[in-house]
Amino acid sequence: NTEKLPGGLAGLSERIHAMGMKFGIWVEPEMVSENSELYRAHPDYAVTVPGTEPARGRNQLLLDLTREEVQEYLIREMTGVFTRSRADYVKWDMNRNFSDYYSQALPAEEQGVFAHRYVLGLYRVIRELTERFPKILFEGCASGGNRFDLGMLCYMPQIWASDCTDTLQRARIQNGYSYGYPQSVLGAHVSASPNHQTLRRIPLESRFAIACAGVLGYECNLSDLSAGELAEIREEVKLYKEWREILQFGQFYRLKGHAAKGRFDT
């Protein structure tokens, strides 16, 4: 939509790259709006049960990824988006629950395997895209960590752990992840204070201490930060870059008695 974004993604990407930065894009391609060219042309591409009113999430329906033609559509469209935008980073998100477990392309006796076929279709799409764009850093996400599993990690080297970025909550979340996954796949960010989910106020140093035990990022409005906070972030990033190989790939030990009562987290 060049009315909203003059020059389109290509123009925006060009400006970002000219600043010496890399360009990332956040996509959520598994849904379809009923007020769209795709739905008007192919209403059968949506996951609905014939004769019933479909469940909608944010006025959207799911695309039926059990169908090969839908998979091909997503591969083609995302290839165009990534090519035009010259993306360096892609966050692949999925923010609604499954509903209306039914495919108009499956016979009645196979409707029970709909969810399994859907995930196999998703794997085909992201396998094709990650092979076409080996230089793009892909990060998986599904309302946080709802797809944090070994299947997605076959195609994407890191996954967003949770939409809850509160430092105390994240300490427990990331500790739990550490029993099954290495730190190098764990997306962890320093976010605003007070925290958006819990309204808890936590010092920047403490937020960094937890977020650096994974793949570090910052999701703050830089214009809201003081000169002192920006200087502190610069030092944190410098420290992380110096030690990130150990933080991501070193041997990880947990302190005994972690969060026994939730009052003295380590």
Regions found by a protein language model. Name each.
Residues N1-P6, D44-P50, Q104-Y118:
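Glycine-rich tight-turn/loop motif centered on a GG-T
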Residues N1-R40, E72-R76, R117-R127:
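Aromatic- and glycine-enriched glycan-recognition loops and surfaces
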Residues M19-F23, R86-D88, F133-I136:
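Short, well-ordered coil/turn segments that N-cap beta-strands
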Residues F23-V27, V90-W92, E139-G140, Y218:
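Hydrophobic faces of well-ordered beta-strands that scaffold small-molecule active sites
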Residues V27-S33, W92-S99, A142-R147:
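Short, solvent-exposed turn/loop segments enriched in Gly/Ser/Thr/Pro and often Arg
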Residues S33-E72, H116-D224:
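Glycan-recognition surfaces
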Residues L63-D93, L129:
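An active-site-proximal structural segment forming one wall of the substrate-binding cleft
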Residues E219-T266:
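Glycan-recognition and catalytic regions of carbohydrate-active enzymes
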